[in-house]
Amino acid sequence: MRPPAFWFTPPDRPALAARLLAPLGQAYAAATARRLRAPGHRAGVPVICIGNLNAGGTGKTPTAIALMQRLAARGIEAHVVSRGYGGRLEGPVEVDARRHRAADVGDEPLLLAAFGRAWVARDRAAGVRAAEAAGAQAILLDDGFQNPSVVKDLSLIVVDAAVGFGNGRCLPAGPLREPVEAGLARADLLLSIGGPEAQRRFATDWPALPVPRLTGRLATLQMGMYWQGARVLAFAGIGRPEKFFASLRAEGAELLRAEALDDHQPLGEALMKRLEIEAMALGAQLVTTEKDAVRLPPSFRQKVLTLPVRLEFDDGSALDAALDRLNLTARS
């Protein structure tokens, strides 16, 4: 289900629906604040939370990949702990791409497991304990910023610069899980992801934020595929599929059809067969995101191309300084 348009009107000009739903948004914010007062488990290794204030996709998965790689470059074995949204396993269980499917552990953990060790646990504290027992030198908590069950040593809030914090209101009046001021008061860093124009607009709409701000962009990973002039039928079931379609166009692909699916939508045989027939009729190649690709039926994995993207920081010095303060210790 796509988010309603009134979530993204300017904060100083809320739509009628947002104003009518404001009391429910205030109740949601109050419930979140009460929940956050609960005590949490203190791990024996640093816990880095990659969270957001918005419901839906903001770029947490590419951020987790970038942090895994950054920590690996320091000699640190970081394990990701995720709730495993969309998967059936409650865990704690370590994700194994050889035996797990997205229906078992969720698409994001399955993708992250290609870059390092990843765990799924409905009980995040139990997942952290399992990862620590398995030798993790640092924990990357995928989401969970509004979950108090684990004490965080570093919290990085990720926001899509193109949409910012929407109308600044909490669910269901707006896209927020908690008020911006309350969330950023607990955060250590804010990462806004987007191109130069989106970054300028975000800085104008949300000036004087009480937390250091990093900027970055999602860049296409060059894998030898020449996209210029390629006729494609693109499909994506992510938070903002239009970003994926825009990336393909920026690479020079000719999008003959773009199908936006619901976030985490299952890619069953019937759906994929329909898309395959449409692509054949158009003379187009099926293309999707890395995160969607892990949900493909086995019979379609060789038929669908992916456009991988990676997070590139404009200046990662503030992040590196924050990691330095964690006193991470690499094992020999």
Curated annotation (Swiss-Prot):
It catalyses: a lipid A disaccharide + ATP = a lipid IVA + ADP + H(+). Keywords: ATP-binding, Kinase, Lipid A biosynthesis, Lipid biosynthesis, Lipid metabolism, Nucleotide-binding, Transferase. One of its GO terms (molecular function) is tetraacyldisaccharide 4'-kinase activity. The keyword Signal does not apply. Its EC number is 2.7.1.130. Pathway: Glycolipid biosynthesis; lipid IV(A) biosynthesis; lipid IV(A) from (3R)-3-hydroxytetradecanoyl-[acyl-carrier-protein] and UDP-N-acetyl-alpha-D-glucosamine: step 6/6. Transfers the gamma-phosphate of ATP to the 4'-position of a tetraacyldisaccharide 1-phosphate intermediate (termed DS-1-P) to form tetraacyldisaccharide 1,4'-bis-phosphate (lipid IVA). This is Tetraacyldisaccharide 4'-kinase. It comes from Cereibacter sphaeroides (strain KD131 / KCTC 12085) (Rhodobacter sphaeroides).
